[in-house]
Swiss-Prot record:
<dbReference type="GO" id="GO:0005886">
    <property type="term" value="C:plasma membrane"/>
</dbReference>
<feature type="transmembrane region" description="Helical">
    <location>
        <begin position="40"/>
        <end position="60"/>
    </location>
</feature>
<keyword id="KW-1278">Translocase</keyword>
<keyword id="KW-0813">Transport</keyword>
<keyword id="KW-0812">Transmembrane</keyword>
<dbReference type="GO" id="GO:0022900">
    <property type="term" value="P:electron transport chain"/>
</dbReference>
<keyword id="KW-0472">Membrane</keyword>
<comment type="function">
    <text>Part of a membrane-bound complex that couples electron transfer with translocation of ions across the membrane.</text>
</comment>
<feature type="transmembrane region" description="Helical">
    <location>
        <begin position="70"/>
        <end position="90"/>
    </location>
</feature>
<dbReference type="InterPro" id="IPR003667">
    <property type="entry name" value="NqrDE/RnfAE"/>
</dbReference>
<keyword id="KW-1133">Transmembrane helix</keyword>
<comment type="similarity">
    <text>Belongs to the NqrDE/RnfAE family.</text>
</comment>
<keyword id="KW-0249">Electron transport</keyword>
<feature type="transmembrane region" description="Helical">
    <location>
        <begin position="94"/>
        <end position="114"/>
    </location>
</feature>
<keyword id="KW-1003">Cell membrane</keyword>
<dbReference type="InterPro" id="IPR010968">
    <property type="entry name" value="RnfE"/>
</dbReference>
<feature type="transmembrane region" description="Helical">
    <location>
        <begin position="182"/>
        <end position="202"/>
    </location>
</feature>
Length: 223
């Protein structure tokens, strides 16, 4: 029986979060979370790729032999990354100049490939699409949260340059939370990413343990 949709959503957003539980996608997590806007943009790009890739693999899984599945998965992810890369270059060019170097690296991100192998290759189309979407959104939430903490403490702002990603209305989100010269510079550098990500992983574990939840790794959600 295919997975329940509620379980898919809960796993993707919290219980099996790709960053906070599985520790996957650490390259963009360290490099692209200097600000909340960068984390949000990178996360949404990854979510789009994961949703589309899961959908395609679920549709064609019966036509792909076990021996060649990994190269096929990589080609599917690469094709979707190319679409996202070209779209961001066309419609979000200023943000693309910041994120563009790392968008192609989504192909080598272990999280999309892990979900293709663990879920999309075994489950029907709609659950697979939702798994990719919500695993991607969970990844987005983690990157945005890490970016927000690093940005606020490191440079005293929140959602700086959000208008580049979300449009002119998003200037309302751009806040100055403390004077710029009060910031702790190390937090907007890669070591700060390791520090904040590690603290968030610990915080999630403590919340889960306090709630009496079993700590487990992600897999297919079949019941």
């Amino acid at each position: 029986m295919s997975a329940s949709y509620g379980r898919i959503i809960k796993d993707g957003l919290w219980e099996n979060n790709g960053v906070l539980c599985m520790l996957l996608g650490m390259c963009p997590t360290m490099a692209m979370t200097g600000t909340a806007t960068n984390g949000l943009g990178m996360g949404l790009a990854t979510a789009a790729v994961m949703a589309a890739s899961n959908l395609m693999v679920a549709m064609f899984r019966n036509y792909v032999t076990h021996e060649v599945r990994i190269p096929v998965y990589i080609l599917i992810v690469a094709a979707n990354v190319t679409f996202v890369d070209l779209g961001m270059n066309a419609w979000m060019h200023e943000l693309y100049k910041v994120l563009g170097l790392f968008i192609p690296l989504i192909v080598s991100n272990c999280l999309p490939l892990a979900r293709l192998e663990a879920f999309a290759a075994k489950e029907p189309v709609l659950p697979s699409f939702l798994d990719g979407l919500f695993m991607g959104l969970g990844f987005t939430l983690a990157l945005t949260a890490i970016g927000a903490v690093r940005e606020m403490i490191g440079q005293g702002t929140l959602f700086a340059d959000a208008a580049l990603l979300l449009g002119p209305w998003a200037k309302l989100l751009e806040l100055r939370v403390m004077p710029a010269d009060w910031g702790i510079l190390v937090l907007i550098l890669p070591p700060g990413g390791f520090l904040i990500a590690g603290l968030m992983v610990v915080a999630k574990r403590l919340v889960d343990l306090a709630g009496g939840k079993e700590i487990k790794m992600a897999g297919a959600h079949s019941v």
